[in-house]
Amino acid sequence: LAWKIAQSPKIEKLYIAPGNAGTSAVGENVAIKATDFPALKAFALEHKIDMIVVGPEDPLVQGIFDFFKEDAATRHIAVIGPSAKGAQLEGSKEFAKEFMLRHHIPTARYKSVTAATLEEGLAFLETLTAPYVLKADGLCAGKGVLILPTLEEARKELKEMLSGMFGDASATVVIEEFLSGIECSVFVLSDGEHYKVLPVAKDYKRIGEGDKGLNTGGMGSVTPVPFADEVFMEKVRKRIIEPTINLSLIH
């Protein structure tokens, strides 16, 4: 994000909080955590910041957009990112699944499970075929999804996740039907009414060679994606993006 934003002729100065060795080459790193909203506010006011582009999920789920918009001193600053409520689509897999069902957006068959409903979860696993998909409900930096080859492993890992494997993030676990096929990430900017689709990417999350092993936050990605042609993207727009933003009710 910093590398691309820095290329804009409209940018006079770019700060990255907290930044890293790579971002220091394109802007000025600032030693402020992305979730330290009061410190970010003070910095933004002192340096007359016009726009904040939020990258990570954590500050969005914790309400950075709302924090700046609800404060008279900072509401003039453009914050690129959803409200805390909107960020729940990423912050809670259970919320996202319920949202998709409610708005008739295609998604895999699933069941949400807690420690109190473990037996129901184990019974649901019996109705699925391998491999088995377990997802921690909350944020785990991209590591909260397990894909298990056998029912025995799925049962064992479900119990461990509900016992605190990912802390509070796995107090609820979403068991999901495995969908085989190609995968890509579609990025969309929206003001809540209009939208713009950004370049599509294919993310490679598995830690091992040959796309094997546990998921990470991402080992690398490639763009453009050859299979994301116009026919494919039209399906994505009509079946996923527009129902999500509710454009179908506007046009």
Language model regions located:
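ATP-binding N-terminal substructure of ATP-dependent carboxylate-amine bond-forming enzymes
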Residues: 1-84
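Short, well-ordered alpha-helical microsegments
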Residues: 60-62, 121, 183-184
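Active-site nucleotide/adenylate-binding loops and adjacent lid/helix of ATP-dependent enzymes
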Residues: 76-77, 89-174, 180-181, 193, ...
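Conserved phosphate/anionic-ligand binding catalytic regions in large, soluble enzymes, centered on
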Residues: 212-223
